């Protein structure tokens, strides 16, 4: 849930948004159809069932299908061997934004457009890692410049009760972590931090669903091994 400070600013923000229809675009970094399976099994709250529409589900790094998945890093600077980092074949194997742009799947542009038109972006189940730096940077710059908000739902193993000081320190740390991983200029950084609302003690990760994790893991490893062997 949101702590009182963020709940107040959140409520003030959403008052200016029409609640006649809530359209969701889901951008997933997962290679599997997990999000589709979850969406199929969950039931909407009766109060919102007629208002919420899942418009699109975008797989940023593609899916486990005949086209293959996109595994790798964000840019050439994240490849340690500099003699290979700018080689076209290495880029076509390891640089995720390059693969999407060269294959012209249109996924990157569709995902950016989804971010552009959103009133609110919910970060859920993401590591904010450097290998997807372009996405965190794009999101941060856009939210800093436009009237959008970010709901940040981190995974926390420790959900024990905190006193007020601990809550403030915890929330400040989460906001800083989120903003730091967006690699923003000072003015954009200052603009985006008040727009990040951290969730505390959330149970969003408790779906109660059974997934064949090992099977999906094996598929990912197999495709990665095939790609690496093809470039050797």
Please provide the spans of the model-predicted regions.
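SIR2/sirtuin-family catalytic core signature
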Residues: 109-232
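Short, conserved clusters of charged catalytic residues that mark active-site
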Residues: 8, 106, 134
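Extended, H/D-rich, highly charged conserved domains that either
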Residues: 1-103
